[in-house]
Amino acid sequence: MGQKVNPIGLRLGINRNWESRWFPVKSAIPENISEDYKIRKFLKAKLYYAGINQILIERTAKKLRVTIVAARPGVIIGKKGSEIENLKNEVVALLKKDVTINIKEERRPGSSAQLAAENVAMQLEKRVAFRRAMKKVIQSAQKAGAKGIKISVAGRLGGAEMARTEWYLEGRVPLHTLRAKIDYGFAEAHTTYGNIGVKVWIFKGEVLQKGIQAEKTDEAPKKSRRSRRGR
């Protein structure tokens, strides 16, 4: 089960919080869901190169607040805050209601699964070899303190005639352990040979009563594993 489902959705309410936080009356639920989708789709497309990790949406009776967690907040804010004001006006025009936008910096972009997936996808679009792109992201995640990382790429890798899936695994990624804090990200690389899907799982530690704790290090370090599946 843990291998198939989205690890973030599986852990909601356990060690992950919702990214849309509001409690409306029943009749307003479809409209709010539609607005949340429009906001995320618009911001992801417009601010793709800002390295967006999360878009948090909070609603009260009369207010709508959007918090953007990005690796490069300066790209969003612009000189003297000019870009953020233009962005707010565009979102207001999209929804026809007042919106407050906050920007937060992602202090550890190397440990973000979504940013890692987008990094691999951008390298594939620049014709970088997929194995080289995957290994580079794995090294960045390990330097950022990740306990384990798994990257999977699927499609016509290297321009091959037949699509296949390849994945790398470093460390541990316990998908069945609900107390494990696992980040997940997905991105698509649009290449001349077709789309290549990129999935990334990053294991950050186990969430206990006192928060995330590092694992015991008295065991011998495990060797890296790589496997290929599929034709």
Swiss-Prot record:
PROSITE patterns: KH_TYPE_2 (PS50823), RIBOSOMAL_S3 (PS00548). Residues 39-107 form the KH type-2 domain. It holds the Pfam family KH_2. SUPFAM superfamilies: Prokaryotic type KH domain (KH-domain type II) (SSF54814), Ribosomal protein S3 C-terminal domain (SSF54821). InterPro entries: KH_dom, KH_dom-like_a/b, KH_dom_type_2, KH_sf_prok-type, Ribosomal_S3_C_sf, Ribosomal_uS3_bac-typ, Ribosomal_uS3_C, Ribosomal_uS3_CS. Keywords: Ribonucleoprotein, Ribosomal protein, RNA-binding, rRNA-binding. One of its GO terms (molecular function) is rRNA binding. One of its GO terms (cellular component) is cytosolic small ribosomal subunit. SMART domains: KH. GO terms for biological process: translation. PANTHER family: 30S/40S RIBOSOMAL PROTEIN S3 (PTHR11760), SMALL RIBOSOMAL SUBUNIT PROTEIN US3C (PTHR11760:SF19). Part of the 30S ribosomal subunit. Forms a tight complex with proteins S10 and S14. NCBIfam families: rpsC_bact. Belongs to the universal ribosomal protein uS3 family. HAMAP family: Ribosomal_uS3_B. Binds the lower part of the 30S subunit head. Binds mRNA in the 70S ribosome, positioning it for translation. This is Small ribosomal subunit protein uS3. It comes from Campylobacter hominis (strain ATCC BAA-381 / DSM 21671 / CCUG 45161 / LMG 19568 / NCTC 13146 / CH001A).
